[in-house]
């Protein structure tokens, strides 16, 4: 009791200083309108309240209605400018490193690692990004990655039994995880070590999106344990290759990302470990959710499935005699497929917002963004803006074929933008296109029970997106 009484004056002083700081900032700057919410807590819990993935949620709707598309708040423990404005979002992303920099909560860096590309800034981020870009270059996509994408697609689809019911979300995760494990460390699907890594990764992901409470039994604590297990696997692979290299016994494995980072960069072991872990996270989780969304939206739009199937029937008949598998030229013919991919990403919004911080005082549209303030460009709010997209809550892949498609594309940021544009965006589109090609040619599907995607803010299908499939004969 005595200890609590001693803490009370400290808490009151801290609260007073916090309120005084906010008030001084308001007087000094012409801030956007908004609300600071509760001291310290701000409005974070309301902002993160789960809602339908094809909406921006009650919090955003109410704040935009009351304050406009640019407003201030207090989120994640920091004063924040929230932007549902397409022009400001582009301005923030295009001025990375000059006016703004990446600024995720510390808990993200704690679990992904301090050398993760998601949290790095400056020269180190540039160097890590270059390694990733070179590994996933257009030439490698054509020659090395596309055949493997098709192989992993067929492995998953051929395991489906006629008339069976299963989780499409889990199948999508299995597909993208096996693909990334193969690309990153040449690990084959179904092998005990690969399956162990996948189980650890499931635990790891639950912690990434949980509250950062690090004590035994919490998802965050379990995720840190899984992080250690995953890194141990990567480190063991590194040591095996160093041993083979010392013996002059190289191999095909050196052509994966681990070999690429070891042989064509000056990265330290710790940096390579965090790089591979973060790319496994980025390449698996977002791509699998995007694919699950496409399956979900297509199920309720038979016209789109019909047009998609017609396109892929024509493509499958265009192959050259003796040619095995899809060619790059055939992939480039998948025009409507890319409309479906774009629309799934626009409506579903896998990446709903990003974290940035002003590194100097910035003025925009008459408002001040003070140095040190967080800025959240909310892509979902732009993608679902009725002034930019007609009937924005309807799945309409044909909108990407219209005369206004250039305007539509200008406001489309599913992979971020600027210096931090997702390095795996082309690979992600390739994965979805190849999977959809074989899916629509070989199967019909329907939802086994009513379902919808929710934003937590990470996306998830609460029931796993259960579907029932029937083979096309």
UniProtKB/Swiss-Prot annotation:
It is found in: Membrane. InterPro entries: Cyt_P450, Cyt_P450_E_grp-I, Cyt_P450_sf. Mainly expressed in leaves and roots and, at low levels, in fruits and stems. Pathway: Steroid metabolism; cholesterol metabolism. Its main location: membrane. GO terms for molecular function: heme binding; iron ion binding; monooxygenase activity; oxidoreductase activity, acting on paired donors, with incorporation or reduction of molecular oxygen. Disulfide bonds: none annotated. It is an enzyme of class 1 (oxidoreductase). It comes from the Eukaryota. Keywords: Brassinosteroid biosynthesis, Cholesterol metabolism, Iron, Lipid biosynthesis, Lipid metabolism, Membrane, Metal-binding, Oxidoreductase, Steroid biosynthesis, Steroid metabolism, Sterol metabolism, Transmembrane, Transmembrane helix. One of its GO terms (cellular component) is membrane. It is a single-pass membrane protein. It catalyses: cholesterol + reduced [NADPH--hemoprotein reductase] + O2 = (22S)-22-hydroxycholesterol + oxidized [NADPH--hemoprotein reductase] + H2O + H(+). Changing residue 278 to G: Mimicking CYP90G4, increased cholesterol 16S,22S-dihydroxylase activity and production of furostanol-type steroid. Canonical brassinosteroid (BR)-biosynthetic enzyme capable of converting cholesterol to 22S-hydroxycholesterol via sterol-C22 hydroxylation. Belongs to the cytochrome P450 family. This is Cholesterol 22-monohydroxylase CYP90B52. It comes from Paris polyphylla.
């Amino acid at each position: 009791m005595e200890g609590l009484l001693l803490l009370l004056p400290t808490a009151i002083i801290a609260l007073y200083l916090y309120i005084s700081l906010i008030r001084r900032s308001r007087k000094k700057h012409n801030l956007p309108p908004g609300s600071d919410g509760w001291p310290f807590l701000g409005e974070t819990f309301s902002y993160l309240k789960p809602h339908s993935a094809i909406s921006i949620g009650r919090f955003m709707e109410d704040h935009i209605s009351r304050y406009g598309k640019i407003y201030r708040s207090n989120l994640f423990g920091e004063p924040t400018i929230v932007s549902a404005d397409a022009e400001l979002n582009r301005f923030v992303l295009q001025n990375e490193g000059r006016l703004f920099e990446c600024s995720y909560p510390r808990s993200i860096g704690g679990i992904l690692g301090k050398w993760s590309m998601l949290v790095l800034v400056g020269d180190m981020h540039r160097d890590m990004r270059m390694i990733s870009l070179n590994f996933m270059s257009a030439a490698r996509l054509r020659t090395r990655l596309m055949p493997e994408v098709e192989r992993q697609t067929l492995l998953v689809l051929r395991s489906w039994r006629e008339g069976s019911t299963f989780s499409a979300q889990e199948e999508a995760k299995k597909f993208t995880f096996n693909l990334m494990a193969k690309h990153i460390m040449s690990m084959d699907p179904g092998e005990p070590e690969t399956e162990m890594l996948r189980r650890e990764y499931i635990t790891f992901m639950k912690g990434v999106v949980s509250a950062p409470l690090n004590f035994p039994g919490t998802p965050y604590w379990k995720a840190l344990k899984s992080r250690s297990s995953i890194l141990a696997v990567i480190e063991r692979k590194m040591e095996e290759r160093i041993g083979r290299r010392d013996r002059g016994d190289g191999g095909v494995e050196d052509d994966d990302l681990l070999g690429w980072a070891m042989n064509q960069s000056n990265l330290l072991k710790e940096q390579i470990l965090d790089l591979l872990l973060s790319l496994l996270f980025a390449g698996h989780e977002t791509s699998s959710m995007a694919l699950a969304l496409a399956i979900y939206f297509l199920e309720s739009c038979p016209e789109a499935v019909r047009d998609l199937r017609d396109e892929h029937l024509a493509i499958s008949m265009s192959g050259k005699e003796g040619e095995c598998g899809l060619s790059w030229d055939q992939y480039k013919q998948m025009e409507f497929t890319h409309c479906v991919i774009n629309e799934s990403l626009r409506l579903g919004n896998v990446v709903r917002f990003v974290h940035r911080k002003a590194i100097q005082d910035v003025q925009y549209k008459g408002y001040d963004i003070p140095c040190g303030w967080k800025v959240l460009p909310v892509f979902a709010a732009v993608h679902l803006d009725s002034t930019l997209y007609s009937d924005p809550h309807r799945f309409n892949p044909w909108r990407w074929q219209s005369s206004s498609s250039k305007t539509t594309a200008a406001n489309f940021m599913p992979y971020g933008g600027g210096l931090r544009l997702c390095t795996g965006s082309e690979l992600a589109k390739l994965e979805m296109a190849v999977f959809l090609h074989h899916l629509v040619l070989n199967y019909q599907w329907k939802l086994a029970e009513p379902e919808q995607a929710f934003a937590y803010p990470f996306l998830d299908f609460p029931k796993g997106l259960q579907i029932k499939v029937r083979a096309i004969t």
